[in-house]
Design a protein with these regions (language model features):
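C-terminal cap/linker of serine protease catalytic domains
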Residues: 2-10, 115-117, 121, 130-134, ...
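Catalytic-histidine neighborhood of serine endopeptidases
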Residues: 2, 26, 33-79, 89, ...
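Flexible, gly/ser-rich surface segments that form the specificity/activation loops bordering the active-site cleft
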Residues: 93-155, 163-167, 183-196
């Protein structure tokens, strides 16, 4: 059963979450920086990597769309993160960065993004690509697992929230509305245990895998902060 959503957190999530659109993909992202008239959005690498011309449309909370570009100069190795930027004179809220290292199993978390599909009923679904802001979704849940070692692609925050295709790259927020992770893996992914290969190349035990596949997974914001510090060094 999902937890009730704090209205303040819901408002923050709506303001900082964007939809990233290209000819081939649709995903989500979160605004993490504003400098002069340039906004930087953090998302998943798998949201942006398959687009050939590397330009995107970003849908912001006011319903406007902006031309954005993938910052290919900032690479995160195998970690499934990417940055895109857009320029505008409009003013948008920037996410406040939380401390993912202080999360504990059982803590409330909220996951936001723009699902690609909407189930009309058990037999019929509709694409949300042209829905605009109406497609936005915010789910509540709890931290379910914090393994000592991350997955090969940086995922290390398991949570009970339901996320859907298209919500990849969207924010995971703590109870104060601070950014603690980036959505990226939904529950019971295709590919089985191989999807959960650990950073050292090993696979989890069958018992651990069964717990992992029953959760959604995010990359902790602390992982991003460490990578950015390393790149700037």
């Amino acid at each position: 059963m999902s937890e009730p959503i704090n209205q303040q957190v819901a408002e923050i999530a709506h303001l900082i979450t964007v939809r990233i659109l290209s000819d081939s993909v649709s995903g989500s992202g979160v605004i993490i920086q504003h400098q002069n008239q340039t906004y930087t959005v953090l998302t998943n690498n798998h949201v942006v990597a398959d687009n050939q011309d590397k330009t995107y449309q970003v849908l912001t909370a006011d319903g406007r769309t902006h031309i954005a570009k993938w910052l290919r100069s900032t690479q995160f190795g195998k970690v499934d993160l990417a940055l895109v930027q857009f320029t505008t004179s409009q003013s948008y809220r920037v996410a406040e960065i939380g401390n993912s290292n202080k999360l504990s199993v059982g803590d409330a978390v909220y996951a936001a993004g723009f699902p690609n599909w909407h189930w009309i009923n058990s037999e019929s679904i509709e694409k949300t690509r042209n829905w605009g802001l109406k497609a936005f979704k915010l789910t509540s849940g709890k931290v379910g697992m914090l393994p000592a070692q991350s997955l090969e692609s940086g995922y290390q925050l398991g949570y009970t929230n339901d996320i859907a295709e298209g919500m990849s790259g969207g924010p995971v927020l703590d109870i104060s509305g601070k950014l603690v992770g980036i959505n990226g893996k939904s529950k019971y992914p295709l590919g089985g245990i191989d999807v959960f290969k650990l950073a050292d190349g090993s696979l989890p035990s069958q018992a651990v895998f069964q717990k992992m596949e029953a959760l959604s997974w995010a990359i902790p914001i602390g992982t991003f902060q460490q990578l950015v510090s390393y790149l700037k060094a």
